[in-house]
Amino acid sequence: MKIDDTGAGADKSMAASQVGNTTKALYWVAAVTPCDKAGRFDPGAMRAIMEWHKQAGADGIVVLGTTGEFPSFSVAERKQVAKTVLNNKNGLNVIIGPGTPNIAETIDLAHHAEAHGADGLLVIPPFYFNQPPIEGLTAYFSMLFDAVQLPTSLYHYPQTSRVPISFELLKNLKHYPYLAGIKDSSGDPVGYSEFVRTFPDLNMCSGSIKNIGIALENGMGAILGEGNAFSKKCADIFTAYRERGDWRAAIAKLIDAQKAIDDAAADASYSAAQKYILGLEMGMAEIYVRAPYVQLTDAQRSSLKAAFERIKATEK
């Protein structure tokens, strides 16, 4: 891959490989994609949500990931979402998820993100395929790295994608200067610790609140869906870390709050619950999900609202 040694190209390459400082210990919200009742993307709500996270203290947002319901949107719609976000960054570091099962659309979406000023990419492996060989996955990601010059993290979420990011795959791609790291949403502390130990020069971001402690102990970042409902609680963890405060206590507060939400609507989709609590936090109209997810029932809304009010009461 040809690398631009001057200007923005050099800056991006450097950003992908920074080591040995606190630059990597950043907090991104794995942002929801707001829709109206008819299922249409709501640009105004997206801008308001971005400002909310900025004011809460987030370093950035990841758009069109799992919590953002990316498979529910067409390529054209995903470009609309990305363009809306990238035109309204306001100091947030913005990472776009361009992943699809086919490399042509993935590269197309990645090019679009690059052209509109994305700071990076988070790419899920080509899903649905039954145990694709390591050679095929290496070829898929190599084509992406050959086409786009943006810091790019690979998305390890095997419970959902059914295609894990392996150590062998990362080693095969390690020579690409724009390989930034991974997002590990597996929730497996042993596996995540191995990623961190094996690739200390990359940003091995935790996508699970269970592993934020491991991330920060090793100077790594986190990309958190819980940041939708609890943006400030997530930001408080990283503020405490940077200020040498009690960041472990801040993690415990986040875990307790999220457990209360999980218990209140165990049968609701994660995205629907996060959208509902975010709407309550912001005092805005309900933020809807897209099919195949379904909207919350009245009983689920009532239960979530009661849990939310109990959480808020403990903060006073």
Regions found by a protein language model. Give the residues of each.
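Active-site beta->alpha loop and helix N-cap motifs at the rims of alpha/beta catalytic domains
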Residues: D4, S17-R162
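Alpha-helical structural signal in soluble globular domains
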Residues: Q80, T84-N88, H112, H116, ...
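Short secondary-structure transition/capping segments
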Residues: F73-A76, I107-D108, P133-G136, I165-F167, ...
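C-terminal alpha-helical cap/extension of soluble enzyme domains
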Residues: K2, A15, L26-T33, A56-A58, ...
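Short, amphipathic alpha-helical "lid/cap" segments that border enzyme active or binding sites
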Residues: P43, R47-M50, F167, R301-F308
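A general structural signal for well-ordered alpha-helical segments in protein cores
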Residues: M46, R78, A82, T106, ...
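Catalytic alpha/beta core domains of metabolic enzymes, predominantly
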Residues: P158-Q258, D262-A266
